[in-house]
């Protein structure tokens, strides 16, 4: 019987269950000021791993927390609703939400495109990444922090931004329908050039 292909992910830092089990969290405030003391940004009672510096906290909260469109929850994790029964929306308030939307979205697309050998391997992949993000062992580039998971976790869309993707079913280049279901989460691109400084096909053509 042929062995199923796909990635097999061995756990190094986590055990099945809660990937954040050994991480201590604390509530902090993030405040960024100008040299004259005027406040540029401030957000209180945000949840951050206790090992993070204040600089890392400020970057995470001010730059990478989604500031709108996120379902708000109570202390027990229950979604809050207003008097009309509509879900109360607001910002992300915990770095755990950010780690979750990144790792769970990566896992989702990996499973959807057949990357993993088993569901257990997909879960290991997700859990290990959550732990590595929370402990600062790994971090993606800024477009990932900004965009990844906003549609998958929060159903956010937004107007199309001119992004294109290859439809895996048809193999054809297809325009994206909105901002976040297939976002542009990359900051750098590799382009082929000749080893030449000034002539055609060289670095100046970029």
Model-found features: residue ranges?
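Extended catalytic cores of very large enzyme megasubunits
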Residues: 1-206
């Amino acid at each position: 019987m042929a062995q199923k292909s796909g990635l097999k992910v061995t756990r190094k830092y986590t055990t099945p269950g809660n990937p954040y089990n050994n991480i201590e969290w604390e509530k902090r405030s993030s405040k960024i000021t100008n040299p004259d003391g005027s406040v540029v940004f401030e957000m209180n009672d945000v949840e951050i791993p206790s090992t993070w510096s204040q600089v890392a906290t400020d970057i995470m909260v001010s730059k990478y927390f989604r500031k709108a469109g996120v379902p708000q929850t109570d202390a027990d994790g229950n979604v809050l609703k207003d008097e009309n029964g509509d879900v109360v929306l607001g910002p992300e308030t915990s770095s755990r939400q950010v780690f979750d939307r990144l790792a769970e979205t990566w896992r989702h697309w990996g499973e959807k495109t057949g990357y993993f050998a088993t569901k257990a391997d997909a879960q290991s992949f997700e859990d290990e990444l959550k732990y590595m993000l929370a402990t600062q062992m790994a971090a993606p580039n800024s477009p990932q922090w900004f965009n990844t998971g906003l549609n998958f976790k929060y159903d956010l869309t937004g107007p199309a931004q001119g992004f294109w993707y290859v439809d895996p079913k048809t193999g054809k280049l297809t325009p994206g329908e909105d901002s976040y279901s297939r976002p542009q989460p990359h900051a750098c691109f590799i382009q082929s050039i000749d080893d030449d400084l000034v002539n055609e096909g060289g670095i100046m053509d970029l």
